[in-house]
Amino acid sequence: MQFSVGNIYQPSECHTCMDDQTFISTIKTGDKKKIEEMADDLWNYRDLYQRNALMISAMYGRTDLIEFFAARYDHIDDRDIEGNTALMWAVRNNRMESAKSLIALKCSIDIPDSAGNTPICWAVIFGYTDMVKLLISSGANINISNDEGDTPAILASKYGRSECLKMLIEAGCDLNAKNHNAQNVWKAAEAFGRKEILEVLASLSNGR
């Protein structure tokens, strides 16, 4: 399946005296007026990991700045050096309001990082049940697989995220999908000793 992904930023010469610490701290704690005055400098800067102002805003839950930067600059799906989008940073830091704001602004919800993990994959890995619920309700692909062939359901089995698995099952995920090690959800749960996952799977009427 082909994804419409944002550009991975290619660094160019910086024309400001800003550094990573100033860049991040300004977005993290700065007042809105100061940020508006520095808007162009902030947007044109990228940190060591090629993260832009929108990504840092999402990371620290600055929903007000997400809306500000997204309205000013049309790069909502740009990716950093590891392929993370602003939505990915919101998800990985469990910033619900940031994620909701980005989704409302029509960001792409299934852009994978450099390892093939999409936002819902990371939400499952960390066990962020509310985030998983949000992503499912927003149309995330629940059967997408990462570079190891792991679907969100297989990841839930590996990491013992039983509540996440229940949500995925309710949403109609494919329990028979296998990763590159020929593991489906049952085999993954067995391999990682996830008894709680096996109990969830045992409760299914169709069994293995």
Swiss-Prot record:
Keywords: ANK repeat, Repeat. ANK repeats lie at residues 49-78, 82-111, 115-144, 148-177. It comes from Thermoplasma acidophilum (strain ATCC 25905 / DSM 1728 / JCM 9062 / NBRC 15155 / AMRC-C165). It holds the Pfam family Ank_2. This is Putative ankyrin repeat protein Ta0196. It comes from the Archaea.
